[in-house]
Amino acid sequence: RTISQTCPCNLTVLTLGSHNGTHMDAPKHFVAGAKDIAQVPLEKCVGPCKVARFDGLLTAADANRLLADGTKRLLIRGEIEISVEAAEAFAEAGLWFLGVEGMTVGGRDTGTAVHRALLTAEIALLESAVLSAVPAGTYFLSCAPLNMQGLDGSPCRPLLIDFEEKG
């Protein structure tokens, strides 16, 4: 509806999938009986976050290097494919939040296994993030999903605030 003599306001009806655009996967997306998007703890989605650049196949050794400083929230810029072993390393390290630029975290043959490793560990998983203009560094992240019970994912609009911003 639009503003007119009979309607005092604009009102839009949205129809979209839970995995359209930049979105967060809930554990329920790949793990039967797991938490839905409304049950993802918000502290996983808000706080200090490392942005790192990586291209290619991300191995367990690469994952361990990225988390060597104790990072709990990680956004990865670049065209990556996370290996199953890297997903397991992220899970074992206790990572809270992982975001990537691609539409999915795994490869064509490993996507299900990568998702299951990450989501079984209840890592908040962000896909299709727009990070091309974000330099590597540490930021404050705010990336809360919609608070809608039963969903296996949710559109998100991540915000990064530069701790070192001048002015």
Residue ranges, per PLM feature:
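Active-/binding-site microenvironments in catalytic and ligand-binding cores
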Residues: R1-G167
